[in-house]
Amino acid sequence: MTSLNQRKDRLEFNKLQKRLRRQTGSAIVDYNMIEDGDKVMVCLSGGKDSYTMLDILLSLQQTAPIRFELVAVNMDQKQPGFPEHVLPNYLAQLGVPFHIIERDTYSIVKEVVPEGKTTCGLCSRLRRGTLYGFADEIGATKIALGHHRDDIIETLFLNMFYGGKLKAMPPKLLSDDKRNIVIRPLAYCAEEDIAEFARLKGFPIIPCNLCGSQENLQRQAVKEMLHAWERQFPGRTETIFTAIRNVQPSQLGDLELFDFVNLAIDKTATAVEDASDACAVPNWHRPAQEEVVQYVDVLDIH
């Protein structure tokens, strides 16, 4: 019985690994994230996402039709209790080239951010600036971050609800100074899959003592909302992500993205055969009453 369970577990693990490899490979190809000769700086925090990203990239590196270099980089921010030996030991065992950057951003954050306030914003800005500079130093052509599909979707709603912007987290980004390209190879991967993969692989997870135990209330609220939607309407998360990749500016309202001001009638265009029916909603498109109730429930956001 134990042998049977082990074979079943191995089969499930193989399916999960193949799915993550396929999704990561698709994202890399779709956005041309990694090119021949690239030196990719893989940013490791010690969390499940970055461990999974490195593992999958190492696997893809063996079979990719192009040659690229991977260099792991961790930033030791001098947080109390940070286990400095964990990542060096892990990376040395893998045989992966790595660098540990030591920057005492912890003291800066604690000095600047009032007690009880979320430190994530300032902490990430300080970390980003350091990583950008270090990428220049080592000649990295791409900076890989471990954000996944759920991070991207949550960021979309955070910006909508709290920032008044239709803005998410792009799979590929040119930095403001145009000196660095940031890639997110796990952009197509679900957090649930990543968490399970990390558990099965037994990665030596390092908790963040600075912000990991500090609940980011806004992001947590959005995460819970999305989980509730997914339970009630399975597949909704993937549909939202599909929408992020299928933007139609003419159906929104941003004057910078679409020239609404200069819209003009073109009488030479082919006319609709029966203009009286052009704006009618066909019966097949009319939702059933129970469907209407469901959509109203979805909008009841507290």
Curated annotation (Swiss-Prot):
Q: What is this protein called?
A: tRNA-cytidine(32) 2-sulfurtransferase
On whether Cytoplasm is a keyword of this UniProt record, the answer is yes
Per the record, the major location class is cytoplasm
Which chemical reaction does it catalyze? cytidine(32) in tRNA + S-sulfanyl-L-cysteinyl-[cysteine desulfurase] + AH2 + ATP = 2-thiocytidine(32) in tRNA + L-cysteinyl-[cysteine desulfurase] + A + AMP + diphosphate + H(+)
Q: Which cofactor does it need?
A: Mg(2+); [4Fe-4S] cluster
| InterPro entries found in the cross-reference section | Rossmann-like_a/b/a_fold (IPR014729), TilS/TtcA_N (IPR011063), tRNA_Cyd_32_2_STrfase (IPR012089), tRNA_thiolation_TtcA_Ctu1 (IPR035107)
- Keyword terms: 4Fe-4S, ATP-binding, Cytoplasm, Iron, Iron-sulfur, Magnesium, Metal-binding, Nucleotide-binding, RNA-binding, Transferase, tRNA processing, tRNA-binding
Phylogenetic lineage: Bacteria, Pseudomonadati, Pseudomonadota, Gammaproteobacteria, Cellvibrionales
Other remarks on this protein: The thiolation reaction likely consists of two steps: a first activation step by ATP to form an adenylated intermediate of the target base of tRNA, and a second nucleophilic substitution step of the sulfur (S) atom supplied by the hydrosulfide attached to the Fe-S cluster.
What's the stated role of this polypeptide?
Catalyzes the ATP-dependent 2-thiolation of cytidine in position 32 of tRNA, to form 2-thiocytidine (s(2)C32). The sulfur atoms are provided by the cysteine/cysteine desulfurase (IscS) system.
Query: Quaternary form?
Result: Homodimer.
Where along the chain is [4Fe-4S] cluster bound? C120, C123, C211
EC class, as a word, reads transferase
Q: Which NCBIfam families does the record associate with it? A: PRK10696.1 (NF007972)
Tell me the compartments it is located in: Cytoplasm
Q: Specify the superkingdom.
A: Bacteria
As to how many cofactors bind and how, the note says:
Binds 1 [4Fe-4S] cluster per subunit. The cluster is chelated by three Cys residues, the fourth Fe has a free coordination site that may bind a sulfur atom transferred from the persulfide of IscS.
